[in-house]
Curated annotation (Swiss-Prot):
Species the sequence originates in: Bradyrhizobium sp. (strain ORS 278)
Location in the cell: Cell inner membrane
Main location: membrane
Biased composition (Basic and acidic residues): 1-12
Name of the protein in its database record: ATP synthase subunit b 2
Region: Disordered, residue numbers: 1-31
Family, per entry: Belongs to the ATPase B chain family.
InterPro entries per record: ATP_synth_b/b'su_bac/chlpt, ATP_synthase_B_chain
Quaternary context: F-type ATPases have 2 components, F(1) - the catalytic core - and F(0) - the membrane proton channel. F(1) has five subunits: alpha(3), beta(3), gamma(1), delta(1), epsilon(1). F(0) has three main subunits: a(1), b(2) and c(10-14). The alpha and beta chains form an alternating ring which encloses part of the gamma chain. F(1) is attached to F(0) by a central stalk formed by the gamma and epsilon chains, while a peripheral stalk is formed by the delta and b chains.
Gene Ontology cellular component annotations, sorted alphabetically: plasma membrane; proton-transporting ATP synthase complex
HAMAP family: ATP_synth_b_bprime
Function, as annotated: F(1)F(0) ATP synthase produces ATP from ADP in the presence of a proton or sodium gradient. F-type ATPases consist of two structural domains, F(1) containing the extramembraneous catalytic core and F(0) containing the membrane proton channel, linked together by a central stalk and a peripheral stalk. During catalysis, ATP synthesis in the catalytic domain of F(1) is coupled via a rotary mechanism of the central stalk subunits to proton translocation.
The UniProt record lists the keyword Translocase: no
């Protein structure tokens, strides 16, 4: 058994040595061998040409179509946004115009109402002044008439009172003409 184990060790040693010699011997890693460079470059060129053809014929048109579709969508959205902006500006201008018209109309109605009320109140004031002036004139006439009536009654009452006073003081009744003359003189002095 010991021999077989030793042979195995010896065999492994020979196999390892031969593997190292093959790697060092001339069979190296193919990409680093100068003899295979032309075929590697040709394979690389063929691979890149194939990749270019596939990308340019298949992938790029799809990507380009997606980009074009997105650009058209963006342009459409921008156009729609501009249209909506223009519509909103037009609506805002129409609103401002209507608002200005409504304000002007309201101011005109207010001015017209103020003028009507001023004219109406002026007419009412004038009618009231005329009515009051007529009532005042009637009152003054009534007062003058009442005063004249009262004064004529006062003259008679004053004459009777003066005659009674003189009769009480002197015991004799004075002459009616004398008493009336004295009362008239007294009333003219106070009037």
């Amino acid at each position: 058994m010991a021999e077989s184990h030793g042979e195995a060790k010896g065999g492994e040693a020979k196999g390892t040595a031969s593997a190292h010699t093959e790697a060092e011997g001339g069979h190296g890693f193919p990409p680093f061998q100068k003899e295979t460079f032309p075929s590697q470059i040709a394979s690389l060129v063929i691979a890149f040409v194939a990749l270019y053809v596939i990308v340019s014929r298949v992938a790029l048109p799809k990507v380009g179509a997606v980009i074009d579709a997105r650009q058209k969508s963006i342009d459409g959205d921008l156009a729609e946004a501009q249209r909506l902006k223009d519509e909103s500006e037009a609506a805002m201008k129409a609103y401002e115009t209507e608002l200005a018209t409504a304000r002007a109309r309201a101011q005109a109605i207010g001015a017209e109402t103020r003028d009507k009320l001023a004219a109406s109140s002026e007419a009412e004031r004038k009618a009231l002044e005329d009515s009051l002036a007529a009532k005042l004139a009637a009152a003054e006439t009534s007062i003058a008439s009442t005063r004249a009536t009262a004064m004529s009654n006062v003259r008679g009452i004053a004459a009777d009172a003066a005659s009674a006073i003189v009769q009480q003081l002197t015991g004799k009744a004075p002459a009616a003409k004398t008493v009336e003359a004295a009362v008239d003189a007294s009333l003219k002095g106070t009037a």
